[in-house]
Amino acid sequence: PLVANATEYPYTLYRGEALGMRAFMHFDLVRLFAAQYTVNPAAGGIPYATEFSLKTPEFESLAKNYEHIVADLLEAEALLADEEDYAGSGNFMLDRQIHFNLHAVRATLARVYLTMGNSEMAALYAQKVISEGNFSLKEKTGVVNDLAGVLSRKETIFGIYFPGFYTNVS
């Protein structure tokens, strides 16, 4: 199987992570390859893939792109709301900061709302991450480890695990 112990956790956990990651990736693409939302939401956006297909989806407006992004993130937030309750015995639930977890969803919502010019919602979601996330800033002396490629568990909301990232540079 693709995921060991896939039936040990509810479908909502996997779907929540997948929706959050889909929104995160589309958000990065739209920021890189489309106009600025606050300047012209009606401007051309990117194709937003909501299902697997060999055909490229139609290009949409920025407003429609952001509508999809926010909808995916809000659904992911609802699906991941109980993620702390899933202790499980498998490796899947270890190191939640390398999964697209509830805090990653909320941090991304804060970024999306800020990019859309909605400071009130951006502040609301940023505050949720700060107050519920148990994150703290690292001391100055610990920053050296970050430069050496060591993950800061205190400050990491989300990251993608890539074994050998720093040793496979050529």
Show which residues each predicted segment covers:
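Structured, solvent-exposed acidic/aromatic patches
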Residues: P1-G20, F27-S170
